[in-house]
Amino acid sequence: MSKVRIYTLAKDLGVDNAKMLEILDGLGVAYKSVSSTIEEDTVELIKQILEEEGHTASAEPAPAQASGSPASPAQTEAQEAPQPTATATAEREPAAPPARELPHRAPVVTIMGHVDHGKTSLLDYIRKTKVAAKEAGGITQHVGAFEAKTSKGKIVFIDTPGHEAFTTIRARGANVADIAVIVIAADDSLMPQTREAIAHAQAAKVPMIVAINKVDLPQADPEKVKTDLTQLNLVPEEYGGDLIVVPVSAKTGEGVEDLLEYISLTAELEDLRADPQGEFSGVIIESRVDRQAGVLATVMVQEGTLHVGDFLVVGENYGKVKAMTDSNGGRIKEAGPSTPVQVLGFSEAPSSGEKVVSVKNEHAARELVAQRVETRREAENARVQRKKTLEEMMGPLGETRTVNLILRADTQGSLEAIQGILARKETEDVKLNVMLAGIGSPTEGDVLLASTADATILCFNVTASGSVKKAAEQRDIELKSFRIIYELIDEVDRLIKGNVEPVFEERPLGRAEVRMVIRHPKSGNIAGSYVTDGLLRRNAKARVLRGKQVVYEGTIVGLKRFKDDVREVQAGYECGVNLDWNDVQEGDIIEASELVEVAQA
């Protein structure tokens, strides 16, 4: 019995992929994605359902929207469903007017992978074949991104292949790419930078598509690549997983159309939308200083529309858009979502990954920049780093915590031994997530990944260079090197212990009898007391007993011996106790206690 891919059937029947998945869900048919295959009898059932709904199957694909974006299920059904009769309309409850749906936007794609696996060659082939000849001939400057026109619409490619650029942008809190294409050479399979690229894409939580390049070579072995991917828990669809794997050749063009088709399908499922009428916001892709023109910055528009004449603020820098150039080198007056543009107008070159916003005028731009400068100066002067609360560091209480790790070792054997130990160290409360494990010294790319994923870098028998250590210090990343395996294990134990929900018990410190109440104009009532047992300590927990009843629970905010502030007072001495509570009375008993963390096995 023949099988057919879901997206192929949707295309042949002229329906939206989302509609097709909706029907399959109703039939209880299992699938991984729109590229999964279904049986012929299921195809017949789908056709019957569509006919009952009044849809006429078409041998030709449904026409693409003018914008090139995939239609939403609601739009598709509105176009395909028969018009209701007056009787049917009268029987329905009056529906509230639907909220304005945001239009779809083009996907933004980044290409990553190991050096020499063909990232740039693949981009060059796509640019050569998917950018109109007259436009391609007009490209005079590199703007960091380009638009490819396909049968499914526009796809934007970030033209700076490599995970370093991708993660540099993410490290500043910006997400630009919607989809990551991991390029792997069919004759080389997984290499260190391949694993790094995969780790970066996973940390960014963007959908991944694997392009197995160089399949035209005689020594190409795509099956080995697929098998190797399963070792990273990335299972190709044909093996029963959900990873899309596409064999391609950047040299001959084989499979490139399929790759673009899969990118469009993934984007459709992600349902990417943006409001061109909203407030403008974007991200700096790259910037440079041109000797003649001045500062040129490539901006990826994410929301709203950017116009010539707009005032922009990025970091502590602002400027007015004097001119804009699209990815084909042409002058434009405005740019909507998912459009990369080169902007002329900044006085200083902004950094990759910085967020860009628009303001009404120059006065507003100056005010916003001044506010940001003041905020930074206050932070610098105070030299205070905001300490994370226990819940921020460890997640909500009662949930499993995840400790992200990056491992570097001198040999593959050492790596495997360490990973085996880590697997045995996991507990119900703490999960150890090795984001990246590689042979050799840590890199600045590791530090970038650690900064975006809040990871710790552990090195065994390898040392970090001065520049990597400096980068780790600047980003406040824990980077530790070990020569003895047991020391590394001790560090892992420390990390686990630091992520286990602490258990505290209350232990008594001492008791005091209130013998007189002293009225103080600033501090309120002070309890003149005599310590009968143990000791009282400043900042200790306190409760006040009046007879057998507890009348107050709080903290000892201050202790005095005569006129001196003291930290604690032992039994047999008098003192003044400030409870920040004015109802204390003679004869009350103050009991002090402290919370002590209980050691856990």
From Swiss-Prot:
<dbReference type="GO" id="GO:0005525">
    <property type="term" value="F:GTP binding"/>
</dbReference>
<dbReference type="Pfam" id="PF00009">
    <property type="entry name" value="GTP_EFTU"/>
</dbReference>
<feature type="region of interest" description="G5">
    <location>
        <begin position="249"/>
        <end position="251"/>
    </location>
</feature>
<dbReference type="Pfam" id="PF22042">
    <property type="entry name" value="EF-G_D2"/>
</dbReference>
<feature type="region of interest" description="G2">
    <location>
        <begin position="138"/>
        <end position="142"/>
    </location>
</feature>
<keyword id="KW-0648">Protein biosynthesis</keyword>
<dbReference type="InterPro" id="IPR009000">
    <property type="entry name" value="Transl_B-barrel_sf"/>
</dbReference>
<dbReference type="InterPro" id="IPR006847">
    <property type="entry name" value="IF2_N"/>
</dbReference>
<feature type="domain" description="tr-type G">
    <location>
        <begin position="104"/>
        <end position="273"/>
    </location>
</feature>
<dbReference type="InterPro" id="IPR023115">
    <property type="entry name" value="TIF_IF2_dom3"/>
</dbReference>
<dbReference type="GO" id="GO:0005829">
    <property type="term" value="C:cytosol"/>
</dbReference>
<feature type="compositionally biased region" description="Low complexity">
    <location>
        <begin position="57"/>
        <end position="89"/>
    </location>
</feature>
<keyword id="KW-0963">Cytoplasm</keyword>
<keyword id="KW-0547">Nucleotide-binding</keyword>
<dbReference type="GO" id="GO:0003743">
    <property type="term" value="F:translation initiation factor activity"/>
</dbReference>
<dbReference type="InterPro" id="IPR015760">
    <property type="entry name" value="TIF_IF2"/>
</dbReference>
<feature type="region of interest" description="Disordered">
    <location>
        <begin position="54"/>
        <end position="101"/>
    </location>
</feature>
<dbReference type="GO" id="GO:0003924">
    <property type="term" value="F:GTPase activity"/>
</dbReference>
<dbReference type="InterPro" id="IPR000795">
    <property type="entry name" value="T_Tr_GTP-bd_dom"/>
</dbReference>
<feature type="region of interest" description="G4">
    <location>
        <begin position="213"/>
        <end position="216"/>
    </location>
</feature>
<dbReference type="InterPro" id="IPR005225">
    <property type="entry name" value="Small_GTP-bd"/>
</dbReference>
<keyword id="KW-0396">Initiation factor</keyword>
<feature type="region of interest" description="G1">
    <location>
        <begin position="113"/>
        <end position="120"/>
    </location>
</feature>
<dbReference type="InterPro" id="IPR044145">
    <property type="entry name" value="IF2_II"/>
</dbReference>
<dbReference type="InterPro" id="IPR027417">
    <property type="entry name" value="P-loop_NTPase"/>
</dbReference>
<dbReference type="Pfam" id="PF04760">
    <property type="entry name" value="IF2_N"/>
</dbReference>
<dbReference type="InterPro" id="IPR036925">
    <property type="entry name" value="TIF_IF2_dom3_sf"/>
</dbReference>
<dbReference type="InterPro" id="IPR053905">
    <property type="entry name" value="EF-G-like_DII"/>
</dbReference>
<comment type="function">
    <text>One of the essential components for the initiation of protein synthesis. Protects formylmethionyl-tRNA from spontaneous hydrolysis and promotes its binding to the 30S ribosomal subunits. Also involved in the hydrolysis of GTP during the formation of the 70S ribosomal complex.</text>
</comment>
<feature type="binding site">
    <location>
        <begin position="113"/>
        <end position="120"/>
    </location>
    <ligand>
        <name>GTP</name>
    </ligand>
</feature>
<feature type="region of interest" description="G3">
    <location>
        <begin position="159"/>
        <end position="162"/>
    </location>
</feature>
<feature type="binding site">
    <location>
        <begin position="159"/>
        <end position="163"/>
    </location>
    <ligand>
        <name>GTP</name>
    </ligand>
</feature>
<comment type="similarity">
    <text>Belongs to the TRAFAC class translation factor GTPase superfamily. Classic translation factor GTPase family. IF-2 subfamily.</text>
</comment>
<keyword id="KW-0342">GTP-binding</keyword>
<protein>
    <recommendedName>
        <fullName>Translation initiation factor IF-2</fullName>
    </recommendedName>
</protein>
<dbReference type="InterPro" id="IPR000178">
    <property type="entry name" value="TF_IF2_bacterial-like"/>
</dbReference>
<feature type="binding site">
    <location>
        <begin position="213"/>
        <end position="216"/>
    </location>
    <ligand>
        <name>GTP</name>
    </ligand>
</feature>
<dbReference type="Pfam" id="PF11987">
    <property type="entry name" value="IF-2"/>
</dbReference>
